[in-house]
C-alpha cells in the first residue's frame, strides 16, 4: 500500500490540499466577526438604527458569535481533512446557516421600513443587513459540501 492509498477520510493533509475549503471557512469566521461589530461601527459612520442595545446583541452579537465559533471549528477541521462527508461539518455549517438566517429574517423589517418611510435610511438598513446573505450563502455551501460523499477511497 502506498501513502496515497492509505489516505482516508480522517487523514491529516496540508492546508494546501484543500485551499478553497480552508479559505472559505476563514471567510465565514470573519463574516461572523463582522456581524458582531456592524451595529457598533454604525454609530460613528452615521448608520445607527434607533433600537435597544439588547436588540443589537440578539440580532448581531449572538448569531455572530455562533458563526465565528462554528467557522473556526470548520477551519480547524478543513485543515485536517476534507469536509465532504463530515457530519460535524454538516452540524457546524447548519449552525452558521441558522445564525445567518436569523440575521436575515430579523433585518427584513428594517429593509421594509427603509423602503416605505424616512425613519430609516437605506444606507443604515443595508449596513445592518450586509452580513446576512453572505453568511447564509457560504454556510449553505458548507452544508451541501459536508453532506456530499467523501471522495477519498
Predicted segments — roles?
Residues 20-24, 45-67, 89, 120-131:
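Transmembrane alpha-helix entry/boundary detector in multi-pass membrane proteins
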